[in-house]
């Protein structure tokens, strides 16, 4: 969601081979935002992720020390089940991702960016935010939601009192801040 009165142009350039270059450029005033990226709903058959970036488990802007750069694989639904907390919340982000391919029983799709934040979950952020318990999540299991972002705010919580993320894990967009990535078969 954008701040009131703000717009965010998104340019798509598609070549003859079906490669789509996407560029988002912030036009507004300086603003602190929780993330700067796009979500893509994919068909439920696309559940296997292979990526090059920090892994093998989730990493965030303030939780990269345990990640190792490499080639990693995971199943979207199994990864959510292993990483989901007692109550639903956004999880499964991978940082420093240069390419991620989502495949399954149908032809897959590849997302490529320059060290982007990537996630693939069986639920939308809205569904996760509105469920207080795991059993309140939709049972239709009919989608995979991919996030490609230039950045996503860190999780914070250095202590048990719910500390906010440190300044280096929070991000502000300035006029002209852009994010470019590619989608292709």
Predicted features along the sequence, with ranges:
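Beta-strand/loop-rich accessory regions of lumenal/periplasmic or secreted enzymes
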Residues: 1-185
């Amino acid at each position: 969601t954008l701040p009131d009165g703000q717009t965010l142009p998104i340019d798509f350039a598609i070549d003859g081979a079906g490669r789509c270059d996407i560029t988002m450029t912030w036009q507004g005033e300086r603003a602190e935002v929780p993330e700067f990226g796009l979500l893509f709903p994919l068909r439920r058959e696309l559940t296997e992720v292979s990526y090059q970036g920090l892994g093998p488990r989730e990493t965030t802007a303030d939780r990269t020390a345990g990640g190792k750069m490499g080639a990693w694989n995971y199943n979207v639904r199994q990864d959510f089940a292993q990483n989901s907390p007692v109550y639903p919340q956004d999880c499964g982000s991978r940082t420093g991702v240069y390419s991620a391919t989502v495949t399954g029983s149908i032809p897959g799709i590849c997302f490529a960016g320059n060290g982007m934040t990537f996630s693939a979950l069986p639920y939308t952020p809205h569904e996760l935010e509105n469920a207080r318990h795991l059993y309140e999540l939709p049972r239709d299991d009919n989608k995979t939601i991919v996030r490609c972002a230039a950045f996503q705010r860190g999780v914070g919580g250095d202590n048990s009192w719910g500390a906010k993320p440190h300044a280096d894990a929070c991000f502000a967009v300035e006029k002209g801040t852009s994010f470019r990535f590619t989608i292709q078969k």
